[in-house]
Amino acid sequence: MKDTSLALHFVSSGTKESLSAQKDLVERYGHVAAEDADIIVALGGDGTMLQALRDFMNTGKPIYGMNRGSVGFLMNEFVIENLPERILAAQMETIRPLVMVAETEDAPPVEALAINEVSLFRQSYQAARIRITIDGKVRLQELVCDGVMVATPAGSTAYNLSAQGPILPLEAPLLALTPVSPFRPRRWGGALLPKHVTVRMDLLETEKRPVNAVADNNEVKSVTSVTVREAPNSQVTILFDKNHSWDERILTEQFRH
């Protein structure tokens, strides 16, 4: 007999493991169209969760993830039993994405949302040269580096963490501005920014030092400038098991050795 206390819509990464999990869960709890669902259940890794967060942005439908992938920082443990009870007891967190506007020499500006980060990285062996402006004021005249990123709290445990950036609580009203392999200023380790600021990154010597920009998985090649800010009218809700909340996850990650 199916448990129909919650109307669930399941999405999966398409791997054998996630499809098998989806089949078992649908048999037990049923499956409805996304527009009729109370909750979206994502099965896979963090990539699957990011796609679900993008797909269901501004729909008002919370997303509960279960790990059937290789990386699952945004996912809960996969357990078939008592899924509706776990969902109803889960902790809700609001995710607000960034909006990137990337400009190039010979094409219209490209706008894209990023839940994790907007990153710039060098296209060739030549280091990038980037001028960084915050709310109209130049804060760094020239950053020589392999790249630089603006990360959200949700994205602070991803590429940002690999680049030695800070981990941010989800509710923190902050963004992380983190360089990748900075050469000059050599000791500049990045900055924490109020979430309401607008960050502009202008590329210097673009013909000699081409740079690509990426908003999560949306790439724009050979950019001349990139503007990043929090998207003013976009949000989505993610659910975490209470015994494995975001706060617990970031504490565990910071004391991992």
From Swiss-Prot:
Cofactor list: a divalent metal cation
Broadest EC class assigned to this enzyme: transferase
Q: Which reaction does it catalyse?
A: NAD(+) + ATP = ADP + NADP(+) + H(+)
Q: Please name the InterPro entries in this protein's record.
A: ATP-NAD_kinase_N (IPR017438), ATP-NAD_kinase_PpnK-typ_C (IPR017437), NAD/diacylglycerol_kinase_sf (IPR016064), NADK (IPR002504)
Q: Which GO terms describe its cellular component?
A: cytoplasm
Q: Which domain of life is it from?
A: Bacteria
Q: Which residues bind NAD(+)?
A: 46-47, 116-117, 146, 154, 157-162, 218
What are the alphabetically sorted keywords of the record? ATP-binding, Cytoplasm, Kinase, NAD, NADP, Nucleotide-binding, Transferase
Q: Where in the cell is it found?
A: Cytoplasm
**GO process annotations (BP):** NAD metabolic process; NADP biosynthetic process
Predominant cellular place of this UniProt entry's protein: cytoplasm
User: Catalytic positions?
Assistant: 46
Q: Does the keyword Cell cycle apply?
A: no
What is the documented function of this protein?
Involved in the regulation of the intracellular balance of NAD and NADP, and is a key enzyme in the biosynthesis of NADP. Catalyzes specifically the phosphorylation on 2'-hydroxyl of the adenosine moiety of NAD to yield NADP.
Enumerate the PANTHER family for this protein. NAD KINASE (PTHR20275:SF0)
Q: What is this protein called?
A: NAD kinase
Species this protein is from: Brucella suis biovar 1 (strain 1330)
Q: Which gene encodes it?
A: nadK
